[in-house]
A protein has these predicted regions:
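A short LG(V/I)-centered, amphipathic sequence patch enriched
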Residues: 40-60, 79
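Alpha-helical linker/hinge and terminal dimerization helices associated
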Residues: 42-43, 64-86
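Helix-turn-helix DNA-binding elements, focusing on the entry/boundary residues of the two helices
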Residues: 17-18, 36, 50
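The N-cap/first-turn positions of alpha helices
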Residues: 2-5, 29, 61, 68
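Short helix-boundary/capping micro-motifs
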Residues: 10-31
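Hydrophobic residues on short alpha-helical segments
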Residues: 6-13, 58, 65
Length: 107
């Protein structure tokens, strides 16, 4: 299982349509289907069931989605925290001054 599979699963669950999810994820629909099939094989359960042209989460899919949403939320929180920490310890500051006045203060 990898992080991309979790993102893919979340998007398919949200849109309930492989083609639309693949388009939004900028991957081919066969690649998306293969990724979800590999995830289902690894978990040993079916995450989706077909309903006409659309798909629906199975009971296992619904339970797994709760965990995936939590995992992805935690990753976003961690990313934001790291960006915030990195931003507070470095950056760019522009300082302007009037030379005659600054000469007496900066020595």
């Amino acid at each position: 299982m990898n992080l991309n599979q979790l993102y893919y699963f979340q998007k398919v669950a949200q849109l309930q349509h492989y083609h639309q999810a693949a388009k939004e994820l900028n991957i081919s629909q066969p690649s998306l289907s293969r990724s979800i099939a590999n995830l289902e094989e690894e978990l040993g359960v079916s995450l989706f069931q077909k309903n006409g042209r659309n798909i629906e989460l199975t009971k296992y899919g619904s339970i797994f989605l709760e965990h995936v949403n939590h995992i992805i939320d935690e990753i976003k929180i961690a990313e934001n925290k790291m960006k915030s920490l990195a931003g507070s310890s470095s950056g760019h500051i522009d300082i302007g001054y009037v030379f005659p006045l600054a000469k007496s203060y900066i020595q």
